[in-house]
Amino acid sequence: MFKAIWAARWYVLLGLFTFLLILIATTPLHFVWRFAEPAVGRLPVKIEQLGGTLWNGQLRLQVPTLRSAGVIEGQWQLSPLSLFSASPQVHLSLSGDGIRFDGDARLSADQTLTLTNTSAYLDADVLEPLLKRNRTGIKGNFELNAVSGWFNLADRGFGDVAGQLLYSGGDVSFLVDRKTVNATMPMVAGSIEMVGDKAQVNIATMEGTQLIQAYAQQDGWGGVSIRRRFLDVLGQQWPAKADEDTVIFEVSHKIL
């Protein structure tokens, strides 16, 4: 009898593997959510509704800081084999008013969220309520392509950040000496990369002329520096005599 069982060991293992897959697939989402909610709760989103199955699910969420995007609808597809590892992988698609996201995400046991093959779209109108507080306005849309990187939800560390940013161009308004200046911004492109342990975005015209540089550091501080050439692109003049590569504005702030 023992020999018969040993001879059929592969069939036993296959049956056990199949049983585990069926068990996981039929597990109610509300049961799984109890374990996932603490990690998801660290993200700046509010999950309102879940549906579907563990493999193929739907969700509705809101971003408190971007209420103008309304309720965002989402779908996910979970990789079955990744469930047997310490970091399940999911393909996530989100869509709201003027906002879209599509990419692969992996969450490991140490609460590290890794993004790959990520793209996103944002209509500038979604940012209007935030910008109005500083009497600033912008029209057009932003696109992120081929974005990847990791972010630890526990200690807020990050790394391996890379990708491309594109702004369509459009009308902008901002304050200069307490006066509102209106201008038209041309299309610009940005490269996202790691410089040491710092994430950096370099924004330039389509011809490659550098305009703006932004960064985020591991200690949670981020900043932006603007060259005088940026005002030239907007058709504005800088009152002081300065070379076009001179940084005329620089600010840093705690962002993480």
Name the predicted role of every residue range.
Residues 45-136, 147-149:
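N-terminal beta-strand/beta-hairpin edge segment
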Residues 29-50:
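Alpha-helical transmembrane signal-anchor/signal-peptide segments
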Residues 53, 68, 138, 184-188, ...:
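Residues that define the transmembrane beta-barrel architecture of outer-membrane proteins
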Residues 88-92, 112-120, 163-165, 201-205, ...:
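Short, hydrophobic/proline-enriched secondary-structure or compact coil segments at domain edges
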Residues 66-71, 94-103, 121-129, 171-177, ...:
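Short, surface-exposed beta-strand/loop "edge" segments at domain boundaries and coil↔beta transitions
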